[in-house]
């Protein structure tokens, strides 16, 4: 495992986890907004099925946001309401690439979050995040397929 992805478990507190989950929540809000916008503005007959799939992604991302917000509350924190910035484009390939890049980042963060939850003994939360990861990886695969590219490796070095 790359050193950038290793975690000093003893350094993560519940307060840290709440802050990190709020960052994840901001990414989920970003995903909801981008999928809603892109599903309604992507043009061309080759993108009709893609638009429908993006609508499904929007609903799934909203479910993720609700789950993460509930877990933040459970941990004693306050779920925040500000999304990460949403990239807007009228170019279908750019839209899909923006979403693919965001999914890769989200997957890398959630993989790290699972380990952090387990280090704190928050095993149920880790399982919830694993469930989210399954859908995020499905999104990554469908976006890569829509772009006609191989599914990228989500094991990117990320900052906490």
What are these regions (language model features)?
Residues 1-160:
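Iron-associated oxidoreductase/ferritin-like identity signal
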């Amino acid at each position: 495992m790359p050193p950038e992805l290793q975690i000093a478990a003893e350094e993560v507190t519940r307060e840290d986890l709440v802050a990190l989950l709020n960052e994840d929540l901001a990414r989920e809000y970003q995903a909801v907004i981008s999928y809603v916008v892109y599903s309604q503005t992507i043009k061309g007959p080759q993108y009709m099925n893609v638009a429908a799939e993006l609508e499904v992604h929007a609903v799934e991302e909203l479910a993720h946001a609700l789950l993460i917000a509930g877990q933040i509350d459970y941990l004693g924190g306050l779920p925040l309401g500000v999304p990460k910035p949403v990239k807007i484009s009228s170019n279908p390939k750019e839209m899909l690439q923006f979403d693919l890049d965001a999914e890769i980042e989200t997957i890398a963060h959630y993989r790290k979050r699972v380990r952090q939850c387990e280090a704190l003994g928050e095993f149920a939360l880790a399982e919830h995040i694993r469930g989210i990861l399954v859908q995020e990886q499905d999104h990554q695969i469908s976006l890569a397929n829509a772009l006609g590219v191989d599914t990228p490796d989500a094991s990117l070095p990320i900052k906490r």
